[in-house]
């Protein structure tokens, strides 16, 4: 087998929360709502450019989840542009952010949480100034 790279990740939640997640990932993270195949269940596909990177799938109320689902995931990272504008937008929305960096690379990282508490990293490679 040859691994060709990352395809997407999927978050499952009840419909009321799924709409909040959609709004967060579109309005805060900057993904775009795009086409989704006509599955029997409701959901959204969010895109970064032409690539679907996040699938939001409706979970039935009380749907059982594997115990390991909540215990091992730390965060997902997105490569971004526009650090200053992003920091201003996050501050204006009152979103808690932890700013960090990758030593020796010049990469700036902004860590935040989505409405379900999942970790999100916004990664910027551009020089500051």
Descriptions of predicted regions:
Residues 1-4, 92-129:
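Vicinal oxygen chelate
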Residues 1-22, 74-76, 128-129:
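N-terminal beta-strand motif that seeds the catalytic metal site of vicinal oxygen chelate
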Residues 11-53:
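Core segments of cupin and vicinal oxygen chelate
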Residues 12, 77-81, 113:
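Short hydrophobic/aromatic beta-strand micro-patches
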Residues 23, 89-93:
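Short amphipathic alpha-helices in soluble, non-transmembrane regions
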Residues 39-43, 72, 104-108:
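Short acidic/glycine-enriched loop/turn segments that link adjacent beta-strands
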Residues 53, 59-61:
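Short, conserved turn/kink motifs that form compact alpha/beta structural patches or helix kinks used as
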Residues 69-90:
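Mid-chain, well-packed structural core segment of small domains
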């Amino acid at each position: 087998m040859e691994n060709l790279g990352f395809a997407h990740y999927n978050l499952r939640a009840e419909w009321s929360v799924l709409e909040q997640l959609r709004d967060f990932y579109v309005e805060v993270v900057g993904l775009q709502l795009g086409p989704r195949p006509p599955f029997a269940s409701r959901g959204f596909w969010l895109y970064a450019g032409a690539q679907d990177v996040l699938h939001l799938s409706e979970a039935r109320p009380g749907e059982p989840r594997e115990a390991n689902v909540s215990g091992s995931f730390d965060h997902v990272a997105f490569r971004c542009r526009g650090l200053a504008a992003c920091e201003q937008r996050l501050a204006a929305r009152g979103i808690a952010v932890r700013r960090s960096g990758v030593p020796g690379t010049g990469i700036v990282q902004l860590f935040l949480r989505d409405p379900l508490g999942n970790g999100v990293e916004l990664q910027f490679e551009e020089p500051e100034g």
